[in-house]
Design a protein with these regions (language model features):
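Conserved small/polar residues in nucleotide/adenosyl-binding loops
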Residues: 184-193
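A short local loop/turn or secondary-structure capping micro-motif enriched for an aromatic residue
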Residues: 35-37, 60-63, 152, 178
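Terminal low-complexity tails and localization/encapsulation signals of metabolic enzymes
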Residues: 1-55, 91-95, 127, 142-172
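Glycine-rich loop-to-alpha-helix module at the N-terminal edge of alpha/beta enzyme cores
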Residues: 41-144
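Conserved coil-to-alpha-helix start sites within the AMP-binding
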Residues: 173-183
Length: 193
């Protein structure tokens, strides 16, 4: 039985002390929950999970604040994002994917530590997620081009457009958290009919 050194995969704990409200990161002053990996990197015989960091332990008041902020931003389809030109929304999505790639190494390591995936599978999940974002951008360009013309069916002319659906709650599953959250987020905010 060969033990692999975990030194190359070690990460410094990330302590998140902010949450998103009204498009801005707001400082969290309340309680936090620590996030641990089940992987023990200590050499002693006693089990000791590895601290990965901490996250805000949001209470109902802050959760409602975030929800109301999201509803206000959508504004029943009249908010900035849903009324933004398609090309501008696509630029935002591309900028997000580009910035996401800048953090590939740390996200891959977090997937390894937090859910116990090996490096190859973690890299595949990250790369597949980023590729999905870029593919969604390309497909939406095609959809937008084809929807720019009127269609006729049974003597009725129609102009069908796609747009963001609105506010969604997205919980990531344990096995593919990055993929599932990205798929749900993109479909709800960009490409649904």
């Amino acid at each position: 039985y060969k033990t692999m050194s975990l030194e190359n995969y070690k990460i410094d704990p990330i302590h998140c002390k902010e949450y998103l409200v009204d498009g801005k990161l707001k400082k969290w002053e309340g309680e936090t929950s620590e996030v641990y990996s089940t992987i023990d990197i200590k050499s002693e015989n006693k089990y000791s999970p590895t601290l990965l960091g901490s996250i805000p332990d949001m209470d109902s008041e802050s959760a409602i604040e975030a929800l109301e902020s999201a509803k206000k931003a959508f504004n029943r389809g009249q908010g900035k994002w849903p009324t933004m030109k398609v090309i501008d929304r696509l630029k935002c999505m591309k900028r997000f994917a580009d910035k996401m790639q800048d953090h590939r190494e740390v996200v891959v390591k977090l997937l390894m530590w937090e859910i116990g995936k090996n490096q190859t599978d973690s890299e595949k999940e990250f790369d597949r997620t980023v590729k999905y974002i870029y593919d969604t951008i390309d497909e939406y360009k095609n959809i937008d081009r084809s929807s720019s013309r009127f269609e006729k069916d049974s003597g009725i002319h129609a102009h069908i457009r796609r747009g963001p659906l609105g506010v969604v709650l997205c919980l990531g599953p344990y096995n593919y958290p990055l993929n599932a959250v990205s798929y749900t987020h993109l479909r709800a905010h960009e490409t649904e009919e």
